[in-house]
């Protein structure tokens, strides 16, 4: 299950109590105070990691708690500190205060780690209160409570390539071809109900780091106003380095590729205008359904209407044109 938003109550550990104790040894009948301090409560930290792509493992959790500090002991022994809790999250996670909406941190790199809830300080034992005028203090203090915070975690996927298109444009088929994997494919809208992630290996470069590709669920007209799957997944487009628009050029499932492309670009810009600055490629898919003359005719019409866009003819089903797309990825993603 893909989970990209959760709310959690985070509870840091309570500090251990300080204690009142006395030094009792045979040759020290008036040994004085000997009570130790309490241990500090454990803190809650959040750390971004690679190879984690959703909050699925936390979907049934409502709160997380770090360990409490232990009480001090006689012989001036300090209690053991409570164990910290480190919450692992995917790169691309936004951390917000659920009550104020304040952005606490944006996790963009592997290994980024911050303290979100500080553990409570341990209390002081009676040794701490010994002075020249008070040689036998009977005072000790309790440990401080740990911080409690209600937070929201929201994921915006960080991917090299984001596949964007209408339902039934053939995105999932193309995704399977590029990533050499299998996501669900079907001849009905919204086959993809959550983003799928795959790796696209650079052809001829076995030891190069592969590109991360995200298949974004199908966009419909009005997605920027939260129609269809709407805003739930439009946010995942924001952090992709390259947008690959997948448009059905065959005219079988959808009658007008020109209108489709106009709506797709319009919805993205309505959601966030600065997406226009992203690198884009238009993949005209399902050319296996057309004769060569038909392909070129429809391509020419699209180029006329969208002169600033870069187009490529391909078939996710047969693989035709995919090698050219690989070359485009290499040139665009190395810029």
Swiss-Prot record:
It is found in: Cytoplasm. GO terms for biological process: ribosome biogenesis. Transmembrane segments: none annotated. Its main location: cytoplasm. Mg(2+) binds at residues 172, 192. Residues 1-158 form the Obg domain. Keywords: Cytoplasm, GTP-binding, Hydrolase, Magnesium, Metal-binding, Nucleotide-binding. GTP binds at residues 165-172, 190-194, 215-218, 285-288, 315-317. Pfam families: GTP1_OBG, MMR_HSR1. One of its GO terms (cellular component) is cytoplasm. Belongs to the TRAFAC class OBG-HflX-like GTPase superfamily. OBG GTPase family. An essential GTPase which binds GTP, GDP and possibly (p)ppGpp with moderate affinity, with high nucleotide exchange rates and a fairly low GTP hydrolysis rate. Plays a role in control of the cell cycle, stress response, ribosome biogenesis and in those bacteria that undergo differentiation, in morphogenesis control. This is GTPase Obg.
């Amino acid at each position: 299950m893909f989970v990209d938003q959760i709310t959690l109550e985070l509870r840091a550990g309570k500090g251990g109590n300080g204690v009142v104790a006395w030094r009792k040894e045979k040759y020290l009948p008036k040994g004085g105070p000997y009570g130790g301090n309490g241990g500090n409560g454990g803190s809650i930290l959040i750390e971004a990691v690679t190879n984690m792509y959703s909050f699925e493992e936390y979907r049934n959790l409502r709160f997380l708690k770090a360990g409490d500090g232990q009480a001090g002991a006689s012989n001036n022994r300090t209690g053991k500190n409570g164990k910290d809790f480190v919450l692992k999250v995917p790169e691309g996670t936004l951390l917000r205060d659920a009550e104020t909406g304040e952005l606490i941190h944006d996790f963009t790199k592997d290994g980024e780690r911050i303290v979100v809830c500080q553990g409570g300080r341990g209390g002081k034992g009676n040794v701490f209160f010994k002075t020249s005028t008070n040689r036998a203090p009977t005072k000790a203090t309790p440990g401080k409570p740990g911080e409690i915070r209600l937070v929201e975690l929201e994921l915006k996927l960080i991917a090299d390539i984001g596949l964007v298109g209408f339902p039934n444009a053939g995105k999932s088929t193309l995704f399977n071809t590029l990533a050499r994997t299998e996501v669900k494919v079907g001849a009905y809208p919204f086959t993809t109900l959550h983003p799928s992630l795959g790796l696209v290996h650079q052809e001829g470069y076995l030891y190069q780091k592969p590109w991360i590709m995200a298949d974004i669920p199908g966009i419909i007209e009005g997605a920027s106003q939260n129609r269809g799957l709407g805003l739930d997944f439009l946010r995942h487009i924001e952090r992709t380095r390259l947008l690959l628009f997948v448009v059905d050029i065959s005219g079988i499932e959808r009658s007008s590729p020109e209108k489709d492309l106009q709506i797709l670009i319009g919805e993205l810009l309505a959601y966030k205008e600065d997406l226009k600055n992203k690198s884009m490629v238009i993949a005209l898919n399902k050319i296996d359904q057309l004769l060569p003359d038909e392909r070129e005719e429809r391509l020419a019409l699209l180029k006329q209407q969208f002169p600033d866009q870069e187009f490529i003819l391909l078939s996710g089903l047969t693989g035709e044109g995919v090698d050219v797309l690989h070359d485009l990825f290499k040139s665009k993603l190395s810029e």
